[in-house]
Amino acid sequence: MEKQYVLAIDQGTTSSRAMLFDRQGKVAGVAQREFGQIFPQPGWVEHNPREIMTSVYTTITELLNNAQIDARAIAGIGITNQRETAVVWDKATGQPIYNAIVWQSRQTKDICTQLKEAGHEQMVREKTGLLIDAYFSGTKVKWILDHVEGARERAQKGELAFGTIDSWLIWNLTGGKVHVTDYTNASRTMMFNIHTLEWDAELLAMLDVPAQMLPDVRSSSEIYGMTQTQYFYGEQVPIAGIAGDQQAALFGQACFEPGMAKNTYGTGCFMLMNTGDKAVASKAGLLTTIAWGIDGKVEYALEGAIFVAGSVVQWLRDGLRMLGKASDSQAYAERAGDNDGVYIVPAFVGLGAPYWRSDIRGAVFGLTRGTTKEHFVRAAVESMAYQTRDVLTAMQSDSGIELKELRADGGAIANDFMAQFQSDILNVPVLRPEVAETTALGAAYLAGLATGFWGSREEIAKQWAVDRRFEPAMADDKRQGLYAGWQQAVEATMGFRIS
């Protein structure tokens, strides 16, 4: 049977999705299933790994049934995933020994403090391109081995496996036959040397993580193994692409040349700039990460991670009851006319790039008796754009590249007000693509290249198309005045302490 589709599994922080893409890179079917969040203590976030797998199986079945697709028409599977989230499981039974510790979780912050006090920061930065932070997988694995009785000894005997979510999915889909990850996910663990492209013995010793439990690190586009027959009605489908969600979005946005950048507006906000074959060391609070590894060549990116973006609108809806639904934020923001001097710094879990301050709380500034709900909503939406400018300023400083345009994706970019304000505050055109599902599309492209479904990156680049281009339309003095107000608000937030 002719191969007509590539299947992308997009395993995110709150839901799992399965999506079919045709040869034109258009969505041919989608299924989605949410799963539970576990909050054992304030600041801790965990997932049940078995529930994640169930959500993935369910979406695959729903997708094939609803789209009435024969599994033989699927050329391959691409996997993209919430990065940094760590799972440790028993190799013999396939059962997790503890919940998955999620990227957002701060439960390893004390370990991070100890590592910093021991003087490891410079070494970690040079080898991994990362900072010592609870965000990354390494301290999460250490925490599990420290807190589950007998776990470290079992890991040393080769009885336990560690993986980011991509590894966990592939292990299960192949019936425990394949234990791999790709360069992009490995580069987010704080255990992988992005220059030698190997697990680093010095980093593993620092964290006391046995090498026996680690997955093989492979390219982002190759055939890793075949699925078991029960998932695709008796057929075996090759798993042929892996990338962490933000790198997958960079690939799905066809940012193939150095200096091209994308920003994803989801729960958090993640801007990546392709730096080609150069691992650019950041002096401005950004991360150096692997963009992808294809055809024996690794390419790098600079990344700015903003912890709270779209979730500030969810907070207005669920926490403050200011909105009926998140999409109402556009109408409220437009109705306000301006922010009336109100700024929201949404440091609910501290601030990410370029500040990296986990010790501060969110704040609101500039309230008067004339402040309305509309002003509040507008300030929340504007905070996404201001934080993005913080990151872009750092990115241009590190790379020496002046951004010509910003390709944008994620749920919040559907908000026309936010997209236009982003263009205005950056003074750079913002491009919204026709296919909004760029993360899943990137995973599909990686799998399609490995299976011959698509012939080259040039072919993929021709498929990328603009839905709408937002051009800057704000006077420079107004732009600089608004941003100066934001900088003042951030500085004041950093000075506030709860005793």
Swiss-Prot record:
Glycerol binds at residues 83-84, 135, 245-246. Inhibited by fructose 1,6-bisphosphate (FBP). The keyword Acyltransferase does not apply. It comes from the Bacteria. GO terms for molecular function: ATP binding; glycerol kinase activity. One of its GO terms (biological process) is glycerol metabolic process. GO terms for cellular component: cytosol. ATP binds at residues 13-15, 267, 310, 314, 411. Pfam families: FGGY_C, FGGY_N. Keywords: ATP-binding, Glycerol metabolism, Kinase, Nucleotide-binding, Transferase. Key enzyme in the regulation of glycerol uptake and metabolism. Catalyzes the phosphorylation of glycerol to yield sn-glycerol 3-phosphate. NCBIfam families: glycerol_kin, PRK00047.1. This is Glycerol kinase. The lineage of its organism: Bacteria, Pseudomonadati, Pseudomonadota, Gammaproteobacteria, Lysobacterales.
